Curated annotation (Swiss-Prot):
The keyword Mitochondrion does not apply. Disulfide bonds: none annotated. GO terms for cellular component: plasma membrane. Pfam families: Rce1-like. The keyword Transmembrane applies. It is found in: Cell membrane. The gene is ypbD. It is a multi-pass membrane protein. This is Uncharacterized protein YpbD. GO terms for biological process: CAAX-box protein maturation. InterPro entries: Rce1/LyrA-like_dom. Keywords: Cell membrane, Membrane, Transmembrane, Transmembrane helix.
């Protein structure tokens, strides 16, 4: 639902900021190889940095209150892919394509971070989302192509959403195995 509101906001702001639909279409170039070089490379760097944070910092500093687990833990992989594509498209269109193009990198990045309001009370998460937003904005500045930050955004979200899903499945299988062993054990008779 939120992503549909973001798409609507991007369309409404786009009508205000852009003179013509062709101006919006100029922001996208699927043939640009920097989609791979920058988009994939930056996504891998962000994923590795996030994994390092999870390894070296206490979990209460990067815990989002379980919201992402609630969203992704029981979804199928195709549904996760669809949702993360929608999220990446909607957010990059609004924050990079419309806002950054017209009000600048810093302002768009700060608005992006602030709208991830569930992170405002967690200083580490807020720093991370602000840094990632700025990095996505820099990729757009460097390339002028929305596919580049959208690709990175999609990969980052999809990897972590799938990780949440796989952890949920693994935990369920472990719990089933433990329950099965408890039923078979002589103490339970």
């Amino acid at each position: 639902m939120t992503q549909l509101l973001i798409i609507f906001a991007a369309a409404a702001a786009g009508l205000f900021f852009f003179e013509d639909v062709r101006d919006v279409l100029k922001l996208w170039d699927i043939r640009d190889m920097r989609i791979i070089w920058y988009g994939v490379s930056i996504a891998v760097i962000v994923i590795l940095a996030d994994m390092a944070v999870m390894k070296w910092f206490p979990s209460h500093l990067y815990d989002d209150g379980g919201i992402n687990k609630k969203i992704f833990s029981k979804r199928s992989i195709p549904h996760i892919i669809f949702l993360t594509l929608l999220i990446a498209f909607a957010e990059e269109m609004l924050f990079r394509g419309v806002l950054q193009t017209h009000i600048g990198l810093w302002t768009a990045s700060l608005i992006f971070a602030a709208l991830h309001f569930r992170y405002l009370s967690k200083w580490l998460l807020f720093i991370m989302v602000t840094a990632i937003s700025f990095l996505l904005g820099l990729m757009y500045e460097w390339t002028g192509n929305l596919f580049v930050p959208m690709t990175a955004h999609f990969i980052i979200d999809a990897v972590f959403a799938c990780q949440i899903r796989f952890e949920h499945v693994r935990r369920d299988k472990h719990d089933e195995h433990v329950e099965s062993r408890e039923k078979k054990s002589p103490e339970s008779l």
